[in-house]
UniProtKB/Swiss-Prot annotation:
Domain of life of the organism encoding this protein: Bacteria
Subunit organization: Homododecamer. The 12 subunits form a hollow sphere into which the mineral iron core of up to 500 Fe(3+) can be deposited.
Record's keyword terms, sorted: Cytoplasm, DNA condensation, DNA-binding, Iron, Iron storage, Metal-binding, Oxidoreductase
Descriptive protein name: DNA protection during starvation protein
Enzyme class: oxidoreductase
Length: 167
């Protein structure tokens, strides 16, 4: 029984895999996937920041709603990260990488009302939803595009729920 090579080939940035997709398609998909991993990690942490620190009208409903959003966001980021590795890449998921590379605006830590948090969340959910929708058409790997489409559907729904609670 032979084992897979766990080294990069001399001519490639990728780890060896028997996946025969062409290298450029893999590299482009990995780059797009890592961008989403970074954004989704940031969005999951932002969601938890709001979840912990909000106060006011509709607290419990929004507090519990955000838990469900975060669970789905983490599931998507895990799917993206695993796809990166399937293609021979390295998933970039450390806090240091996220801090350095997130395109999201820093989340304010000095807000407390449910309404302030909903507005701040809507801005960031909207940014990620718009970015992933664009990424769907930019990747040549149909499996990656399908993953992005599934995440886009969830983000659009979450954004709708958030915006529906803004007074």
């Amino acid at each position: 029984m032979s084992t897979a090579k766990l080294v990069k080939t001399k001519s490639s940035e990728l780890l060896y895999t028997r996946n025969d997709m062409d290298e450029k398609t893999k590299l482009d998909a990995i780059k797009a996937l890592n961008r989403q991993v970074i954004q989704f990690i940031d969005l999951s942490l932002i969601t938890k920041q709001a979840h912990w620190n909000m106060r006011g009208a509709n607290f419990i409903a929004v507090h519990e709603m955000l838990d469900g959003f975060r669970t789905a966001i983490i599931d998507h980021q895990d799917t993206f990260a695993e796809r990166i590795v399937q293609l021979g890449g390295v998933a970039l998921g450390t806090v240091q990488v996220v801090n350095d590379k997130t395109p999201l605006k820093s989340y304010p830590t000095n807000i407390h009302s449910v309404q302030e948090h909903l507005k701040a969340l809507a801005d960031r959910y909207g940014a990620v939803a718009n970015d992933i929708r664009k990424a769907i058409t930019e990747v040549a790997d149909e499996d990656t595009a399908d993953m992005f489409t599934a995440a886009s559907r969830d983000l659009d729904k979450f954004l709708w729920f958030i915006e529906s609670n803004i007074e």
